[in-house]
Amino acid sequence: MPVSDALPEDLSEVLRHLEACYPQEGCGVLLRAGPWGPWRVRCLPNAYDRYHAADPRRFPHSARTAFLFEPREWLALNREADARNEQIACVFHSHIDGVAVLSAEDRQAAAPGGIPLLPEVSYLVVNVERGQAHEARIYWWREGEFQDRGVPL
């Protein structure tokens, strides 16, 4: 499925999850069976604090300022998507009391060395202030860089 800025019309499940995770970053993925198939939201736990506790040098932040998928959850999600003939279309996460911008760390994680790890996947960032979603932007890789646009909430 070619990467695009497509999103489901109804983001309420995504927004509820991200608001419920406040004051930590929430995260998850949007899956889709082909470019015209139905969307499915899969909320995932933010495992960052567990990794920070085990290795604060390698994981210097907290779940308030960073997110990390649990590798076993990510593997299970990919197997589940394959079994359902779905593709991961979008990774979403929140920024807490800030702005809905794909940060330098987000960009580095998504495209280390300028090469996207998931070239067919877009990234939705939602700013959650005091437990309420306020702003969202979607990012996708095209022609060697991230493109973006605002997303109405």
Q: Which sequence ranges carry the predicted segments?
A:
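Conserved beta-strand-loop surface patch within small alpha/beta domains used
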Residues: M1-I88, D97-L153
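Residue-level "edge-of-site" marker
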Residues: S94
